[in-house]
């Protein structure tokens, strides 16, 4: 029986053009650039003027071009997201439609910030079954939709964006070599949007509002523990030492979490690719965006051993060891882009900020 692997042959990202800076946030929140940077490492984040599926499509188009794979060759699409345009149907089918793919398996996957690692594991195993040849794995989020812009602790953290990779079937030992995904359900309520879904009263007067539960200190402890243990497990299973890991692509949630993860794993911090300063926490999109930029910036070389680690609501966690293939140079490039946005980030958010603050005043 042939042993198949799933090599990453293409990579792409899509970040909205509109930037929301820390200074912008300080115009309507009790915060400052220094306060945010020293606690999170974040300087800017992007605010989308389009739907999640639009960003996912552009990221996929760039990944396809760089892989040299035609859309018609794709037979599997997985979109990791917790902020889809619609619940029914899934947005993987919308991406499929946008790309002009007539027939492919297409589904969404919600594991919050760990979603891309879950998707990478799922896509790899399906390709290894021998039933699929090329897959698009996407992490895409429009988290600005959920944010209570009157709550400083969460409003400063999140942003919008999408990243994608193409997985291609090969007999070379490359791609995902070891992975571990899991969930610590005892802590599911400390990071949640609890009243969004069928549990909400759809006829309530204020059903346009919902809480974003975020217990920062507890999340920090569980994130470091979950990602750290998973990282050690996959390193041991792959029979690699920390010295043999060339690049770490961590979930970009907080610079302190990234630094602590490296310290606990015994991996030098300079091996970790960090771009949280530019985009904030884009949930399932952080890992593929970081992976794409690491390749673009020359941080990834042919044959490199890579460690991916993520943690998210649920509380989901995961880590993976990847071996990069022989190519870091794109086969082609795409000119795909989002439509221009003539509004600033503050203009895009003006109504949401106003209504969130009115709600808080009414509660007092």
Swiss-Prot record:
It is found in: Cytoplasm. The active site is at 113, 251, 281. GO terms for molecular function: 3-oxoacyl-[acyl-carrier-protein] synthase activity; beta-ketoacyl-acyl-carrier-protein synthase III activity. Its EC number is 2.3.1.180. InterPro entries: ACP_syn_III_C, ACP_syn_III_N, FabH, Thiolase-like. GO terms for biological process: fatty acid biosynthetic process. Keywords: Acyltransferase, Cytoplasm, Fatty acid biosynthesis, Fatty acid metabolism, Lipid biosynthesis, Lipid metabolism, Multifunctional enzyme, Transferase. Homodimer. Catalyzes the condensation reaction of fatty acid synthesis by the addition to an acyl acceptor of two carbons from malonyl-ACP. Catalyzes the first condensation reaction which initiates fatty acid synthesis and may therefore play a role in governing the total rate of fatty acid production. Possesses both acetoacetyl-ACP synthase and acetyl transacylase activities. Its substrate specificity determines the biosynthesis of branched-chain and/or straight-chain of fatty acids. Belongs to the thiolase-like superfamily. FabH family. This is Beta-ketoacyl-[acyl-carrier-protein] synthase III 2. It comes from Vibrio parahaemolyticus serotype O3:K6 (strain RIMD 2210633). The gene is fabH2.
């Amino acid at each position: 029986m042939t042993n198949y692997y799933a090599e990453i042959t293409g990579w792409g990202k899509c970040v909205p053009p509109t930037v929301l800076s820390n200074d912008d946030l300080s115009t309507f929140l009790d915060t400052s650039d220094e306060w945010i940077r020293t606690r999170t490492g974040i300087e800017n984040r992007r605010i989308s003027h389009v739907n999640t599926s639009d960003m996912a499509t552009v990221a996929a188009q760039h990944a396809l071009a760089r892989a040299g794979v035609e859309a018609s060759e794709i037979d599997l699409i997985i979109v990791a997201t917790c902020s889809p345009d619609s619940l029914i149907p899934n947005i993987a089918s919308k991406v499929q439609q946008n790309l002009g793919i007539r027939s492919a398996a297409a589904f969404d996957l919600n594991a919050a910030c760990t979603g891309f690692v879950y998707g990478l594991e799922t896509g790899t195993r399906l390709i290894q079954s021998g039933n699929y040849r090329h897959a698009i794995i996407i992490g895409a989020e429009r988290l600005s939709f959920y944010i209570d812009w009157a709550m400083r602790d969460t409003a400063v953290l999140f942003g919008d964006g999408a990243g994608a990779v193409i997985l291609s079937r090969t007999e070379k030992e490359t791609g995902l070599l070891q992975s571990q995904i899991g969930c610590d359900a005892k802590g599911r309520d400390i990071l949640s949007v609890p009243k969004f879904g069928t549990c909400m009263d759809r006829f309530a007067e204020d059903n346009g509002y919902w809480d974003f539960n975020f217990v920062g200190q507890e999340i920090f402890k569980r994130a470091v523990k979950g990602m750290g243990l998973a990282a050690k497990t996959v390193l041991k299973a792959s029979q690699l030492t920390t010295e043999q890991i060339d690049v770490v692509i961590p979930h970009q949630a907080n610079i302190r979490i990234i630094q602590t993860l490296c310290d606990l794993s015994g991996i030098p911090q300079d091996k970790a690719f960090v771009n949280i300063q530019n985009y904030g926490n884009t949930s399932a999109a952080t890992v593929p965006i970081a992976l794409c930029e690491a390749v673009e910036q020359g941080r990834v070389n042919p044959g490199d051993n890579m460690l991916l680690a993520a943690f998210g609501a649920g509380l989901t966690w995961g880590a993976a060891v990847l071996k990069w293939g022989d190519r870091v140079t794109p086969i082609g490039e795409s000119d795909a882009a989002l439509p221009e946005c003539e509004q600033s980030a503050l203009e895009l958010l003006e109504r949401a900020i106003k209504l969130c603050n009115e709600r808080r005043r009414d509660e007092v």
